[in-house]
Swiss-Prot record:
The active site is at R103, E106, S129. One of its GO terms (molecular function) is cyanate hydratase activity. Keywords: Lyase. This is Cyanate hydratase. The lineage of its organism: Eukaryota, Fungi, Dikarya, Ascomycota, Pezizomycotina. The keyword Cell inner membrane does not apply. Gene3D superfamilies: Cyanate lyase, C-terminal domain (3.30.1160.10), lambda repressor-like DNA-binding domains (1.10.260.40). It catalyses: cyanate + hydrogencarbonate + 3 H(+) = NH4(+) + 2 CO2. PANTHER family: CYANATE HYDRATASE. NCBIfam families: cynS. Belongs to the cyanase family.
Length: 163
C-alpha cells in the first residue's frame, strides 16, 4: 500500500478558480503526481508550480510544454487555458476558511507589526516585495520525531522614495 499524500481539488468548493485548475488537478490526481515531482519536471519551485495550478502564477511557454508532457494533457488545450494573465488574490475568501490558510493569515495578523518593526530596524522605511519574491516549504524532523514545517519568504527590500 502506497503512502503518498497528494493535494487534490474539489472545484465545486472553489468557484473563483480558473477553468484551468480543474483540468490541471484532475490530470495530477490521475497521474498520482506530487507538486514536488511536477516541479522537478518543469524546473520550477514546488510552491510556484502549485500557484500555477491555482491560477495565481503565470505559466511560461516552456512551463506549458513541460506541464502538458508530464500531465498528459493536450498541449493546445493547456496553452489555451493558461494563455491569460492570472487574476491573483480572488481565489480565497477573506478571512480564509481553510484552517491551514487561516493559520498563515493568523501568523501575519499576530506577528505582522513585529515583522514590520524588525524589518524597518534592519532595512529602514520600506516594504518587502511580493513580486521580486521567492518562497519554499521544507520539512524538518526534530530529535523527538516531531515534524516541523519551515516556510521561507524571500522578498527584495524596496525602500520608500522621498519626493
Amino acid at each position: 500500500m502506497s503512502n503518498i499524500n497528494l493535494a487534490t481539488l474539489d472545484i465545486s468548493e472553489h468557484p473563483n478558480l480558473p477553468t484551468s485548475s480543474a483540468v490541471l488537478f484532475k490530470a495530477k490526481a490521475d497521474k498520482k503526481l506530487s507538486f514536488e515531482k511536477i516541479a522537478s519536471h518543469i524546473g520550477r519551485n514546488e510552491v510556484a508550480t502549485a500557484a500555477i495550478f491555482y491560477g495565481q502564477a503565470k505559466a511560461s511557454a516552456e512551463d506549458i510544454v513541460k506541464l502538458a508532457e508530464v500531465l498528459g494533457i493536450d498541449h493546445g488545450q493547456l496553452e489555451f487555458l493558461l494563455s491569460g494573465f492570472p487574476d491573483r488574490g480572488k481565489s480565497v475568501s477573506f478571512p480564509p476558511k481553510d484552517p491551514l490558510i487561516y493559520r498563515l493569515y493568523e501568523i501575519v495578523q499576530n506577528y505582522g507589526y513585529a515583522y514590520k518593526a524588525v524589518m524597518n530596524e534592519k532595512f529602514g522605511d520600506g516594504i518587502m516585495s511580493a513580486i521580486s519574491f521567492s518562497t519554499k516549504v521544507e520539512k524538518e524532523t526534530d530529535n523527538d520525531g516531531n515534524d516541523w514545517a519551515v516556510v521561507t519568504w524571500r522578498g527584495k527590500w524596496l525602500p520608500y522614495s522621498r519626493f
